[in-house]
């Protein structure tokens, strides 16, 4: 068991807590959780005797006085949540058995919390329910004009966005290679030059680039990108700054992907290896001129730091890179890159021909990337796509769709939803609502895809460094959430008996380090994974 079990051997938790500091309590609890047996009964006894309070020689009859397993579990979780680090903080937990919905543990489970990226559970569940796991998003390239015998195409090339978030390395897609293939298609049609415009059709969504409640100081960063139905490279650019070594030169700045769409103005002071690297980007939300200020520490040209920053106007960014692919293929272009809103008449007529229709990977794969890596742009595009299906690609309409799905699934309506990713602090929900969603999803037709989308400890994703070596490593699938003074974790855990629980752990208004919040959540998961309803197990 964990800290609570140890405390009882000292005559009660309050006595034990007075004897040890909170950090010591956590260290002991963590060590004991790691000692939790993973295999058969023959290997479990020594660890269980240690957990019971180091009394390996106590008479067998004393086991009869142990609390019932469920009470012992609750006492242990109470002990973990009662250390000084969480005094004054907002702490909520809900653990629910998937067999009949029994509430295994609850603390402040009906209080409202900021969910951070756990919000993505609502978004991805609703998307799977609305579209289905095999749904894909289509982007088209159309020609509206005439191809002359000389190989010159006179007219417009129209790139129409279909809410596909996958054109980036995060989804395993080489967007540059994809555009090169598109240029090859145009070349195969005999097009050697284009006299006209390349038009980006982004009318599937409204023109509101940011969700309500996003902080202004988040906007320069890649995790707070502008949202539209045309998205490329996560609507961001990576800026790498390399130390000049011993040369008295400024640091070298490179962009990936290489682009002239963004201009970086560096103001970086070079330090030796005893210094601290700290880079701060400044970008007006309507500009692609980035001021990069700060310091770069190191002594060799291998000392490089990379920051990922958002770009303004994702539609224009996409068109710029498509034009670059045409130029690489040798297709000359005479015209402008335009948003469809800046064109008087682009209504399809008999000349308009769709020459490329690109379909994304299935939604089940998209939500896996969104939940495992906490991909904000993908979540926001799903929200607006759901709104579009119901008549308007906006945050308001997308939120309405999500709420309707949650009501239908019995999750309830007493929550505030502002965006799809959880970046907004205007989102509010309860631990019970999150656990209920997980329980309902478990029985839904799309539930297998939803569960498979969650991160697993030790594997690719936001849990890759957590719970490793413990029983929970192979028993937990969950979604993380994190922002200043907020840390959340919600998902599924399988107990030692094979019983499945849905759980939600939500922490807010705390000043402890995020690492300590993660440790607390991990310890609760370890304790749940080691739970058995069999007395004495």
Where are each of the predicted segments found?
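A short glycine/serine-rich beta->alpha loop
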Residues: 108-113, 308, 421-424
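Short active-site loop at a secondary-structure junction
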Residues: 106-126, 367
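Bacterial N-terminal signal peptides
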Residues: 22-37
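A short, well-structured edge-of-sheet supersecondary motif
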Residues: 82-107, 338
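N-terminal secretory signal peptides that target proteins for export/translocation
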Residues: 1-21
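Conserved serine DD-peptidase/penicillin-binding transpeptidase domain
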Residues: 43-83, 129-412, 519, 527-537
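Residue-level preference for non-acidic, small/hydrophobic
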Residues: 101, 120-127, 198, 230, ...
């Amino acid at each position: 068991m964990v800290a609570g079990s140890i405390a009882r051997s000292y005559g009660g938790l309050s006595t034990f807590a007075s004897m040890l500091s909170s950090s010591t309590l956590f260290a002991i609890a963590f060590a004991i959780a790691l000692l939790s047996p993973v295999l058969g009964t023959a290997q479990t006894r020594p660890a269980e005797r240690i957990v019971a309070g180091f009394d390996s020689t106590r008479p067998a009859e004393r086991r009869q006085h142990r609390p019932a397993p469920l009470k012992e579990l609750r006492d242990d979780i109470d002990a973990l949540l009662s250390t000084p680090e969480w005094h004054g903080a907002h702490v909520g937990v809900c653990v629910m058995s998937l067999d009949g919905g029994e509430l295994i543990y609850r603390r402040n489970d009906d209080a409202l919390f900021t969910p951070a990226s756990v919000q993505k559970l609502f978004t991805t569940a609703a998307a799977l329910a609305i579209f289905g796991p095999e749904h894909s998003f289509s982007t088209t390239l159309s020609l509206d004009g005439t191809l002359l015998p000389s190989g010159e195409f006179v007219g417009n090339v129209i790139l129409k966005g279909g809410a596909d978030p996958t054109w980036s390395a995060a989804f395993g897609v080489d967007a540059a290679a994809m555009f090169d293939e598109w240029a090859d298609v145009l070349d195969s049609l005999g097009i050697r030059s284009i006299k006209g415009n390349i038009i980006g059709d982004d009318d599937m969504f409204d023109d509101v680039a940011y969700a309500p409640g996003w902080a202004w100081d988040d906007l320069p960063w890649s995790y707070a990108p502008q949202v539209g139905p045309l998205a490329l490279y996560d609507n961001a650019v990576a800026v790498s700054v390399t130390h000049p070594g011993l040369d008295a030169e400024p640091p070298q700045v490179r962009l990936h992907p290489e682009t002239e769409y963004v201009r970086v103005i560096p103001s970086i002071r070079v330090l030796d290896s005893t210094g601290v690297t700290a880079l701060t980007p400044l970008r007006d939300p309507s500009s692609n001129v980035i001021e990069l200020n700060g310091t770069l520490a190191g002594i060799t040209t291998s000392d490089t730091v990379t920051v990922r920053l958002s770009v303004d106007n994702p539609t224009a960014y996409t068109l710029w890179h498509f034009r670059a692919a045409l130029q690489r293929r040798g297709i000359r272009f005479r015209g402008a890159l335009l948003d469809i809103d800046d064109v008087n008449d682009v209504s399809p007529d008999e000349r308009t021909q769709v020459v490329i229709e690109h379909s994304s990977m299935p939604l089940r794969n998209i939500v896996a990337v969104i939940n495992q890596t906490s991909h904000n742009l993908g979540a926001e595009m799903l929200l607006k796509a759901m709104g579009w299906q119901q008549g308007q690609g906006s945050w308001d309409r997308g939120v309405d769709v999500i709420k309707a799905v949650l009501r239908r699934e019995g999750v309830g309506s007493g929550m505030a939803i502002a965006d799809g990713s959880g970046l907004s602090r205007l989102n509010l929900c309860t631990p019970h609502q999150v656990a209920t969603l997980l329980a309902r999803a478990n029985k839904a037709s799309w539930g297998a895809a939803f569960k498979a989308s969650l991160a697993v400890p030790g594997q690719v994703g936001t849990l890759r460094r957590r719970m490793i070596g413990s029983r929970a490593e192979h028993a937990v699938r969950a979604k993380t959430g994190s922002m200043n003074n907020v840390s959340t974790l919600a998902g599924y855990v399988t107990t030692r008996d094979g019983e499945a629980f849905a759980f939600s752990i939500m922490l807010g208004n705390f000043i402890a380090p995020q690492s300590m919040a993660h440790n607390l959540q991990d310890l609760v998961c370890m304790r749940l994974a080691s739970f058995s309803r069999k007395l004495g197990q």
